[in-house]
Amino acid sequence: MERQRVFYVTINARPLILRMNANGHRLTAGAALAIAVALLSCAATGFGAEPDFAREIRPLLAHYCFDCHGAKKAKGDVNFERLSNPLAMPARKLWSEAHSQIRHDEMPPHDKPQPTAAERERLLAWLESAVERIDATAPPNAGRPVLRRLTRYEYRRTMRDLMGVEFDFQFDPTTDFPADGSDAGFDTNGAVLGVSPIHIEQYLQAAERIVNRAIVSDGLDGPRTWRWEAAELATGGGAKLDAGRAFFTAPGRLTREVRIEQAGEYSLRAMVRSADDNKMKAQLALVADAKEEKFTLTRNGKEVRTDRKIKLPAGRVQVGIAYLYEQQEKANAAAEGPMQGEISVDSIELTGPLNLSADALPESHRRVFAGIRPTAERTRQQAAKEVIAKFGARAFRRPLTADEVKHYAGIFAAMDAPEVSFERAMKPALLALLVSPHFLYRVEPDRAARSADGGYSLDGYELASRLSYFLWSSMPDDELFAAAASGKLTDDAELTRQTHRMLADPRASALAQNFATQWLGIRSVENFQPEKKRFGELGTALRNAVLQEPVLIFQDILDRDLSLLALIDADFTFANEDLGKLYKLTLPPLPDEQQKKEGERRKMRRIPLPPDAHRGGVMTTAAVLMASSHPTHTSLVKRGKWVLDNFLGTPPPPPSPNVPALPDRAESGEKLTMRQQVEQHRADPNCAACHKRMDPIGFALENFDAIGRWRDKDESKQTIDATATLPDGTTVNGPDELKQLLLARKDDFTRCLAEKLLTYSLGRTPEPYDLRAVKRISTATARDGYKLTTLITEIVKSYPFRNRALVPSNLHPTSK
């Protein structure tokens, strides 16, 4: 049979399938005429055209809805018959809910007569149009207020940019933070970002560790010296204390614990002498933080002062002096006669940090203090207020009020003392700033100026925070703060310019990493354990490559300003040798010097895809295919649901209770194909309505196994049939034709992605009143060639993003 190529065209938002010979021959005149007639017929019958309510819509409602939602019976207090004006505001909620119920096949009930595909489409088109027309007569709605706590991911990135402290596997104070919840697919949703007592405890501990790591708290006024007399030392082994004297009668240690605020070089000194006039020779060591600096004591009853330079870390360390057993015997062998008497220790001193200057301060310290220190012209209290005002404005992402500066300066004053360094005295105030609700939450307090919907337009600082956490998952930078302070950021032109600048910044990788992984639902791959017997070992290197691929695709589309349709299908992907083997792809060769290095071979790189690769876009990446599979086998339902939810924005309702899952065919021993099993499952009327939407999509992806490899036979060794018929009668065969169908529905995909990004950026579940904004965003994106950067920019410029509703009084943070 001659192979055909399949193309999809869209007429009035409805896909139409055209098939052409694989050799690309043009259609005959007769075939072209037939298609032209079909296209004109489609236009004439009005695919997507708005039907007349009284003549076309009301009869459908009467036939399918009035029995349960009419004058005689009004279940749920829904009565379609009593509507006198279908385009009046009171009907808006009813039509919006009806649209959702019909779109998700929840209404009419499965045991009632069902509309045909054409009737359902006609109803949905009218309902959507009715909601839009009603919305056009009402003021815009910014949506319910959301008080959003920083997620763990945002907290780490904010601390990095605020404090200049890098987080890695060796230093991550957020490790024990409670896991963030998720709602509407994203952990940025304010509904799940509460604070528990465990959060408070962890925030305090994390802030203290970060501040200690970031700032130099001692040494800027000169090295500090600690001195401990003999009686203040702890003894161990042959070390003794008697009448205020410390001495060794045998090998042992004399130590003192000290808290080092600043890592660096220190000088450790000890005053040591023999206790009598006998000649002696003994091996000792100055000890600090498990390090030993050895020295030999050879004197005749005289006091010896010895010192060594030693590097110490920040934190609690043990310093002191040790009399070493092993060296004692060897040293005595060379002495004149056996060792007699005692070794006496008068005192120990520690001085440091040494050689510390303002020029040598770490970047993290400069970010916190901005070069501000007390001087002859600036008192310590004045310097503290300057630091608090400057650092606090960055921490709170807005200027502090005079009362706030006074409050935190009071915390400094309570700690301040002549013997305490300025930086050390500032620590409690810095900690208080970092555990304030105004740092941990993105607070948008009420103001006097109201917008059209009774809410408020965001000021420059609030808008800057929304923008930076949307694109960077972190705080605004200096340029964005400056735009906010000048008032320019609320202008369309400046807001657009800043958005483009920030998308070009490396920090925008957070959007790909944080948004894309949640939108695609691939975080579960981190813990996905496919059955080894069937799929082999999913090693760490391969798993990392699998997780990186869709993120890099999303990032590349942003970086190159490509069409968002490349998320559906593209002629490139990202892979390394590990992923190339999984996909059976031949990667372009690396230069000889790179080929020899394993690290280079494992780097992900952009590669072109051959026409028969069956890859391209994110749907056919191993990450998505694993996330929508079971550990032992594929799942038509999960894959179909994934496409409906994440590409088309039409998720099915939750499954009916007590409906059994499909068994594992390889284990059950049945010879039924997947298609035969699904047909049996769909015989249950509780399952049929949803499965008729999900299963065809899953069938089209059946050539991919549970870890994303291409195959021709399924787990039970049955030949795979990847043909599928959708509810509207459209037929597709395999993933390539499915992608073409999805491309024909590019406006649905654009609208779905717009809704997902808006949900992520606003931190709340989408509401019916968001439909108007989503429609405007997706329409503007389509006009500009479906560019992903345009979609993001239009979201930033949208009414919901730039405005908010009133915050209920019980949500206002009162703590400073």
Where are the predicted features?
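Extended surface/linker regions that mediate inter-domain or inter-protein docking
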Residues: 126, 146, 154, 158, ...
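Sequence context surrounding c-type heme c attachment/ligation sites in exported
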Residues: 48-97, 104, 111-117, 312-313, ...
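Long, ordered, helix-rich scaffold segments
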Residues: 422, 440-465, 476-558, 728, ...
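Beta-strand-rich ligand-recognition modules
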Residues: 273, 279-340
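Short, low-complexity, charge-dense intrinsically disordered segments
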Residues: 15-26
